Structure formats: structure tokens, C-alpha cells
């Protein structure tokens, strides 16, 4: 079916890369619209933000 074309067996975990922020330059989201698109088509997608200082 068209509504579940993105369904996966395991969840998708999105984590930002080079920057320690979820946005490039504080403006553009790192994962853009991908998490919303995936979840709207039956995929389990999670976005995680890592802090630069885990003791902070």
C-alpha cells in the first residue's frame, strides 16, 4: 500500500553529525523533513540530539 511504503522492520534513528546542534547555523534542521515524512508513512523514526558536554 502507498501509505506504508516506508515501513521498516526496525526503527530508524537519526543523530546529527558534525555540529553539536540539531540545526545548521541555527536555521536549517539537520534531518530536515525526513523524520516527519518517514513517520507519516508508517516508519518508526527517532531524532536524537547529543550534547557537546555530557557532564553539563
UniProtKB/Swiss-Prot annotation:
Native species: Burkholderia cepacia
GO biological process per UniProt: lipid catabolic process
Job description of the protein: This thermostable and solvent-tolerant lipase is rather nonspecific. It can synthesize both primary and secondary alcohol esters. Simple triglycerides of short and middle chain fatty acids (C<13) are the preferred substrates.
UniProt name for this protein: Lipase, thermostable
Homology family: Belongs to the AB hydrolase superfamily. Pseudomonas lipase family.
The entry's keywords: Hydrolase, Lipid degradation, Lipid metabolism
Keyword Acetylation among UniProt keywords: no
Temperature dependence: Thermostable.
Catalytic activity: a triacylglycerol + H2O = a diacylglycerol + a fatty acid + H(+)
GO molecular function, one term: triacylglycerol lipase activity
Entry EC no(s): 3.1.1.3
